[in-house]
């Protein structure tokens, strides 16, 4: 079994993004499955093409995308992606769509194929906060989740895909009083637990 794990580059003026930093530190194999890390740009459209090319090259069984959700206090596997781009800030290419469909002829939403409740439980069993989320937002995180699901629907039917949000790192909240954070070590531990849950479910 092979998993493609994607993480976004820094955006919104941040110097770091816990998503790619955690993804880069994942073990090469988890529960006997191969883990392939991939950095993707925080850019509408382009991020999906980068992932598509990686799917063609790597032929993964699962794509799990990881993104930063500043303000959240837990690792949150996402249940659903909606067909809407509505950027609160411009992406890293300066593009800021407002109320635009991601795929004009696509469905209103896609549900993940990943075992989100088992993932959240595994993260909690690792001693970290986690719960299933029903909103991936309307920025590039939701965009990539939707786009990978659309790729599954149109090109790669055997693929399973999903998304998980992780909190800010401690160094990102130094000037943000009261905003929660999680250490990079804990991010890696939580993601590893979530991936193990995916592998176990895939084997059943």
From Swiss-Prot:
Q: What's the protein here called?
A: Pyrrolidone-carboxylate peptidase
Which lineage is the organism of this entry classified under, starting from the top rank? Answer: Bacteria, Bacillati, Bacillota, Bacilli, Lactobacillales
In the record, biological process GO terms are:
proteolysis
What are the annotated GO cellular component locations? cytosol
The record's HAMAP family line, in alphabetical order, gives:
Pyrrolid_peptidase
Complexes and interactors: Homotetramer.
- Where it mainly occurs, coarsely classed, is cytoplasm
GO molecular function terms listed in the Swiss-Prot or TrEMBL record: pyroglutamyl-peptidase activity
Instruction: Please tell me the species this chain comes from.
Output: Levilactobacillus brevis (strain ATCC 367 / BCRC 12310 / CIP 105137 / JCM 1170 / LMG 11437 / NCIMB 947 / NCTC 947) (Lactobacillus brevis)
Sorted keywords for this record are: Cytoplasm, Hydrolase, Protease, Thiol protease
Q: Name the gene for this chain.
A: pcp
Q: What is its EC number?
A: 3.4.19.3
- What family is it from? Belongs to the peptidase C15 family.
What is this protein's function per UniProt?
Answer: Removes 5-oxoproline from various penultimate amino acid residues except L-proline.
Hydrolase among keywords: yes
SS bonds (residue pairs): none
The UniProt entry annotates the active site at 78, 141, 165
Reactions this protein catalyses? Release of an N-terminal pyroglutamyl group from a polypeptide, the second amino acid generally not being Pro
Places the protein is found:
Cytoplasm
């Amino acid at each position: 079994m092979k998993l493609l794990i994607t993480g976004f580059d820094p955006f919104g003026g941040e110097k770091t993004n816990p998503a790619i930093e955690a993804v880069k530190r994942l073990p090469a194999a988890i529960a006997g499955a191969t883990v392939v890390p991939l950095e993707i740009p925080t850019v509408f459209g382009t991020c999906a093409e980068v992932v598509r090319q990686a799917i063609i090259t790597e032929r993964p069984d699962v794509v799990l995308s990881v993104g930063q959700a500043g303000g959240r206090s837990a690792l949150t596997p996402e249940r659903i992606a909606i067909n809407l781009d509505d950027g609160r800030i411009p992406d890293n290419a300066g593009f800021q769509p407002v109320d635009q469909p991601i795929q004009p002829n696509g469905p209103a939403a896609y549900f993940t194929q990943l075992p989100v409740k088992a993932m959240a439980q595994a993260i909690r069993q690792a001693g970290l906060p986690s719960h299933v989320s029903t909103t991936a937002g309307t920025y590039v995180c939701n965009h990539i989740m939707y786009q990978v699901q659309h790729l599954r629907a149109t090109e790669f039917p055997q693929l399973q895909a999903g998304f998980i949000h992780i909190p800010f790192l401690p160094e990102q909240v130094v000037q943000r009083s009261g905003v929660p954070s999680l250490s990079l070590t804990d991010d890696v531990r939580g993601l590893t637990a979530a991936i193990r849950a995916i592998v176990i479910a895939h084997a059943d």
